[in-house]
Curated annotation (Swiss-Prot):
GO terms for cellular component: cytosol. Residues 1-12 have a biased composition (Basic and acidic residues). The modification Phosphoserine is found at residue 492. This is Cytoplasmic tRNA 2-thiolation protein 2. Plays a central role in 2-thiolation of mcm(5)S(2)U at tRNA wobble positions of tRNA(Lys), tRNA(Glu) and tRNA(Gln). May act by forming a heterodimer with CTU1/ATPBD3 that ligates sulfur from thiocarboxylated URM1 onto the uridine of tRNAs at wobble position. InterPro entries: CTU2, Rossmann-like_a/b/a_fold. The lineage of its organism: Eukaryota, Metazoa, Chordata, Craniata, Vertebrata. It comes from Bos taurus. The modification N-acetylcysteine is found at residue 2.
Amino acid sequence: MCEMSEEYRESAPKGPPPPRLGTGDQKCVKCKEGLPVVVIRAGDAFCRDCFKALYVHKFRAMLGKSRLIFPGEKVLLAWSGGPSSSSMVWQVLEGLSRDSAKRLRFVPGVVYIDEGAACGQSPEDRARTLAEVKLALQTTGFPWHAVALEEVFSLPPSALRCSAQEAAGTEGAYKAAVDSFLQQQHALGTNGVERQSQHCAQDPQSPTGPPTTAQTQALSRLFDSVKTLTAKEELLQTLRTHLILHVARNHGYSKVMTGDSCTRLAIKLMTSLALGRGAFLAWDTGFSDERHGDVVVVRPMREHTLKEVAFYNRLFAVPSICTPALDTKAPEKASIHRLMEAFILRLQAQFPSTVSTVYRTSEKLVKAPRAGCAAGPRCLLCMCTLDVDTADSATAFGAQTSHLPQMQTPVTQARAAAGPCCCAGMGGAPGCCKREDPRAQVMEQLCYGCRVNMKDLPSLELLPPYILSEAQLRSQRATAEQEIREYLLGDSEDEAGTGES
């Protein structure tokens, strides 16, 4: 029997709790002398100096072992103001300083994309943020370019064309370039790098002024018309990439650095799988992305986790600017990106090897087309090769492709039934009156992932003009090639004719 006078709760201990064993005597796991200030993983406690050495070594090793960036090459740093990209700019800034043991040999520049109109910021908030951005960029001493996202409405269609890529240099070519660069710097004197950096810093900045009211309204209408947050984030990423590449080409940059961290790439890998972009994971998450031809995107921060970035920025006072994004204050299930982010971070909190496992899996992906599949056309938006067998209707891509010819408006069907082209017998171009449905014209030039996102955009006419113009140009080129295909000589016929002669 229970008695009312019984007390089942133990009395609270008096005095301070006993100290944990080993915390006072714990030393840095690397130098075994300094007091640890950072615990990256369980049991990995580093002092301030050893943590900085590890952090810098990861960044330098990622650039050094790839040997993609040659000495004297112009590299554009894509800076968003966030922790990872700010840390990347800080690493480059320290790597170019005179006190650095192994100095970086490329010529950097910084680009910032103002996305305030897409995120719903007021003009006053955008002006305040832009003033902070310009002040932060001026302190770096690098040439900088602050561009508004509205500039996508003035891009030329050539921004979506993959230019010819130079052949990758061999190890001997890289060593020869290093020797030539060192000899040049020795001839210029000890301050050769500073002179080159100062000359680059004196280059005029982007002359783009504030966006026009019409451009801002067009961008707002575009993002307001998108139904889901997932499609908005994908569209924003696509337009941002196009604008950065356009700035890089206009100012002579052959490489673009992004601040994607290990944690962010793990989330991106899972998100891309959910969005149907599994065929392009090697380009979306790898160290280098060569899909754009003359401009290569590199990710030197892919070995750093968000935890390491946060600790480094805190310990060494790396400045950053916090700006609202599309998913700011959005619930967990508002988009696939937010859902995957919450899923990965929750798993990482319970199982600390989650991010590293997903990240190491992405390193095993190979950038190669399928066997027997020649390099075909590229996606209009993401610029990836459409390496999918469209004849296989068992796949979602094949099923969508088979229905595209049936997507015709009543106007198109009426024109087709009206008879031959009006200009066919008057010296005009055959089929000039034949106009496809603009939506079908764009959709047939997209990969599966981009098609899924474009379904949430009711009208494609709200897209920037350069996308619609390039889609129309590609469609006309494909039609012309189809009409003259029977008059072209194939490779086998050409060789046979040469042998007979």
